[in-house]
Amino acid sequence: MATIKEVTALLAQVDSLDSPVWDQLAQDERAGVQAAIKKRRKELEKEAVEDARLEAMLFYEKSLYENGVEFIAGIDEVGRGPLAGPVVAAAVILPKGCKIRYLNDSKKIPKSKHEAIYQEVMERAVAVGVGIKDAALIDEVNIYEATKLAMLEALGKLSQKPDHLLIDAMKLDTPIPQTSIIKGDANSLSIAAASIVAKVTRDKMMADYDKEFSGYGFAKNAGYGTTEHLEGLNKLGITPIHRKTFEPIKSMVAGGN
């Protein structure tokens, strides 16, 4: 009779809930074996749910592939709402059929997993481009236009020209065919990939700014108007990376602070 350790090793090789191994092991009444079976089944059930989620997020991509499109770029941005720092956009072309576990809208991914998923996207992507527009440009042209410019910059930095664009709720001035998707980062894997690249890139920039401009909590709040950030503004005033057309900074500038 196989030891519990051997049974556990065997179960680790099972990758389907339909495997005949389950019926074979069901006859083994040892508590350790039954616990190992329960644990492995739960793991596979969780993987099946994740596979189904990823498959659903490839709906737009698969439709385009079926129509002969080869290279699809997902485009998304991070940083439209903060009071400080740039808006960052990313464009990502994933290989056909690529599934990256736990890739989702970056806002739904635990921060502890950001870096690992970012690295996997960077390793597996056909091409990645990043566009960055600073606070000065945001103040000059407005955040909506700056976001579009960041997206176009990211698109222009791709080493492979895409045949079609999937964009999160935006339309770009480009001859490349495009599809604008509401909540695209939660409904398209390509856009989700762009979302995590933009998020990690911007978070790293804000962490660097935190060292340069201490007292605002940029490493933690990424430039959003948290209590710590607002207190820093009141005590220290504005920095060169603050958006002067955003309140309350706009009023502070008008008041001479």
From Swiss-Prot:
Give the binding site residues for a divalent metal cation: 76-77, 168
RNase H type-2 domain: residues covered:
70-257
Functional note: Endonuclease that specifically degrades the RNA of RNA-DNA hybrids.
Query: Biological process GO annotation list?
Result: DNA replication, removal of RNA primer; mismatch repair
Entry keyword set:
Cytoplasm, Endonuclease, Hydrolase, Manganese, Metal-binding, Nuclease
NCBIfam families, A to Z: PRK00015.1-1, PRK00015.1-3
Q: What reaction does this catalyse?
A: Endonucleolytic cleavage to 5'-phosphomonoester
Q: Which GO terms describe its cellular component?
A: cytoplasm; ribonuclease H2 complex
Cofactor names: Mn(2+); Mg(2+)
**Which EC class, in a word?**
hydrolase
UniProt name for this protein: Ribonuclease HII
UniProt-listed Enzyme Commission number(s): 3.1.26.4
List locations, semicolon-separated: Cytoplasm
Sequence similarity = Belongs to the RNase HII family.
Pfam families this protein is in? RNase_HII
Q: Which organism is it from?
A: Streptococcus suis (strain 05ZYH33)
InterPro entries from the UniProt entry: RNase_HII, RNase_HII/HIII, RNase_HII/HIII_dom, RNaseH-like_sf, RNaseH_sf
Cofactor binding, per record: Manganese or magnesium. Binds 1 divalent metal ion per monomer in the absence of substrate. May bind a second metal ion after substrate binding.
Extract the GO molecular function terms from the UniProt entry.
Answer: manganese ion binding; RNA binding; RNA-DNA hybrid ribonuclease activity
